[in-house]
Design a protein with these regions (language model features):
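Contiguous segments within soluble domain cores/interaction surfaces
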Residues: 32-187
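Secretory targeting signatures
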Residues: 1-34, 71
Length: 187
């Protein structure tokens, strides 16, 4: 074999082996989670384990009632919230998308207040500020981000997808988003 051909074979082998290793260690594969009443499993990002902490008040959501969601990601080793989190939230019911947007908090705890509007509007309005760096909604100091409009206005099961896209610094984008899927029941 010529020296040039040997280099091509070695390079190709390296690419194939690297692709296989990366395929087995994809953060999104480890972070995929289903939530059916119990917390989703921790996601592995490098040497860290991040746990989703999502709390809802009231815990039993009723149609057309308001609900406050508090969403944070806990670093298990430090037992503290991960700072500068950005995530995309997608809410759907029966395969129909209801809300999809990005949310951010510098301290790592996003509070979302859902208020159903009485009336005929089929869209939502979001009360908060746009963060220039992350292009995501952030809260006014001391207040939650408010989402007005029909979101949880029908009884049944809702799918909430969360794709974590930044951690630790507003400029630190994850190579692949960490995905969580949660089922929420509305009565």
């Amino acid at each position: 074999m010529t020296k040039c051909r040997m280099s091509v074979v070695v390079f190709t082998s390296f690419l194939l082996l690297g692709g296989i290793v990366v395929g087995f260690y994809s953060p999104s594969q480890e972070a995929m989670a289903q939530h059916h009443g119990a917390p989703p499993p921790a996601a592995a990002i490098e040497d860290r384990k991040l746990t989703l902490d999502m709390q809802m008040k009231p815990t039993n959501i009723t149609q057309s009632g308001g609900v406050l969601m508090t969403i944070a990601f806990l670093d298990e080793e430090k037992n503290a919230n991960v700072q500068h989190v950005t995530f995309r939230m997608d809410i759907s019911k029966d395969g129909k998308h209801i809300l999809s947007d990005f949310f951010h908090d510098h301290n790592g705890e996003v509070k979302l207040m859902f208020k159903d509007n009485e009336g005929d509007s089929s869209s939502q309005t979001i009360g908060g500020n746009q963060d220039v760096l992350t292009n995501a909604w952030i809260a006014d100091p001391g207040s939650p981000i408010t989402i007005r409009g029909p979101v949880f206005n029908q009884s049944g099961n809702y799918d909430i997808g969360l794709d974590l896209t930044t951690i630790d610094n507003d400029k630190t984008d994850l190579i692949e988003p960490v995905e969580y899927h949660l089922d929420v029941k509305v009565s």
